From Swiss-Prot:
Protein's recorded name: tRNA-splicing endonuclease subunit Sen2
Primary location class: nucleus
Disulfide pairings: none
Catalytic center residues: 364, 372, 411
Record lineage: Eukaryota, Metazoa, Chordata, Craniata, Vertebrata
Subcellular location: Nucleus; Nucleus, Nucleolus
UniProt source species: Mus musculus
Gene that specifies this protein: Tsen2
Length: 460
């Protein structure tokens, strides 16, 4: 057997973020005051481990690239804002996301279906949505001192912002195209939009109540009814609890001005088209929350190896032994895959799921934003006599096919053998202490090409 040759990881051509110090040790490169050791919180829901807190999500992914946003490719940065509209309305100073009228109507239809499934009749559903999605006066907000040359946001009867291109342009802040957040300062002035308590009447939740008209329907509905849960309420941390209390999310919808003709709009330039549009402030009837989903191996590594994650099930914290047993019940191969995950993480690699390329793990240097995966890993658990039931018994044909797939994507195929003593029983595997007796052997599989080997011999 020839000795494997180490190949340097292949760096990505474009890197769009800086490397942060990994958990749990804060390095000197982090700016700001030195923070104390932090315990993150997660929940086990439907055999999945999820993190809801916004700050916890950012820290876990940014410092070690743990987990994945359920609505994003990797980093949880989902937003409903339209970047094209944000650039078009760059003169508007707002933290609210700007979306198209079509996207807003999709959310109205989702909310309509949600209310129908709750058993409401069509007239009640229509009344709820009509009151809830009426145009709103712009909430009060303090003007920033660094931009005194611009006019404050005006609130008119039509509750809209007219497009201003040539003069009186309104300033813009980066929040318009970024993550959509609730408006700051709500409830601080008497003439601002007021947020209700945990349960509010339709009159309190309806825009008409702010204009001096009280809705006639006295029915009391929870805010979760008015704002259906597309994801989960972010309630795992104090900051996320504050996000839950802010029951409504406000959006700006780009709508046509009255009297604008489709033929004229199609032939008009962008500047003229913007003059025929307006921004209307409305409530978002169907909010979608993104959370960070951790694999079972990532969750256990954070809880067991780093000790920086507390996992709850039905509001009860789970011990390390209970986590080991619960994850094994959910995923029978968890013990084997976690031992390999723990080993490679301890070596400084960032392991990710390798299902895309038919393997158990992919190994990244630093993280996926910086390097391509170097190795595709197959994991097997054997005894010290190299005997045992294989998780994936390969034939020469299937092994050659997997090797060819890994080679075509510039990755090396690694066979990771976890060797346990022959005296280790099933009872010994019931706790993570069994890992102290496990040995690891790595075998890199490479395809032998006769023509290439012949040319190498001729050169020698």
């Amino acid at each position: 057997m020839a000795e494997a040759v180490f190949r340097a990881p292949k760096r990505k051509r474009r890197v769009y973020e800086s490397y942060e110090s990994p958990l749990p040790i804060p390095f000197g490169q982090d700016q700001g005051p030195r923070k104390e050791f932090r315990i993150f919180q997660a929940e086990m829901i439907s055999n999945n481990v999820v993190v809801r807190g916004t700050e916890d999500m950012e820290q876990l992914y940014g410092k070690g690239y743990f987990g994945k946003g359920i609505l994003s490719r990797s980093r949880p940065n989902f937003t409903i804002a339209n970047p094209t509209l944000a650039a078009r309305w760059k003169g508007v100073q707002t933290d609210m996301p700007i979306i198209t009228s079509e996207k807003y109507q999709h959310r109205v239809e989702w909310a309509r279906d949600f209310l129908r499934r709750q058993g409401h009749d069509e007239s009640t559903v229509q009344k709820i949505l009509t009151d809830y999605t009426e145009p709103l006066e712009l909430p009060c907000r303090e003007e920033k001192e660094e931009t005194p040359q611009h006019e404050p946001l005006s609130s008119k009867a039509d509750s809209s912002l007219e497009g201003r291109v040539e003069k009186d342009e309104l300033p813009v802040t980066p929040g318009g195209a970024g993550q959509s957040d609730d408006l700051p300062g709500l409830g601080t002035h008497s003439d601002c939009l007021q947020e209700g308590p945990g349960h509010a009447t339709l009159a309190a939740a309806s825009p008409s109540s702010h204009n001096g008209h009280v809705a006639e329907d006295p029915e009391v509905l929870p805010q979760e009814t008015l704002v259906p849960q597309g994801g989960l309420w972010p309630e795992a941390s104090s900051q996320a609890a504050g996000e839950k209390r802010a029951a409504h999310e406000y959006v700006l919808i780009e709508e046509e001005l009255c009297g604008a003709q489709e033929e004229e709009a199609a032939a008009a330039s962008d500047e003229k088209l913007l003059k025929r549009k307006k921004l209307v402030c409305r409530r978002n009837p169907y909010r979608i929350f993104e959370y960070l989903q951790l694999s079972l191996e990532e969750a256990f590594f954070l809880a067991y190896a780093l000790g920086c994650l507390s996992i709850y099930y039905e509001k009860e914290p789970l011990t390390i032994v209970k986590l080991w047993q619960a994850f094994t019940a959910v995923q029978p191969t968890f013990r084997t895959t976690y031992m390999a995950y723990h080993y490679f993480r301890s070596k400084g690699w960032v392991p990710k799921v390798g299902l895309k390329y038919g393997t158990d793990l992919l190994l990244y240097r630093k993280g996926p934003p910086f390097y391509h995966a170097s190795y595709s890993v197959i994991i097997e658990l054997l005894d010290d006599n190299y005997e045992g039931s294989l998780r994936r018994p390969f034939s020469w044909k299937s092994l050659a096919a997997l090797s060819r797939v890994s080679g075509n994507v510039s990755k090396e195929l690694m066979l990771c053998y976890l060797i346990k003593p022959s005296t280790m029983t099933a009872e010994d595997m019931e706790t993570p202490e069994c890992m102290k007796r496990i040995q690891v052997q790595e075998v890199i599989l490479s395809r032998w090409v006769s023509s290439r080997e012949r040319s190498d011999q001729d050169e020698l």
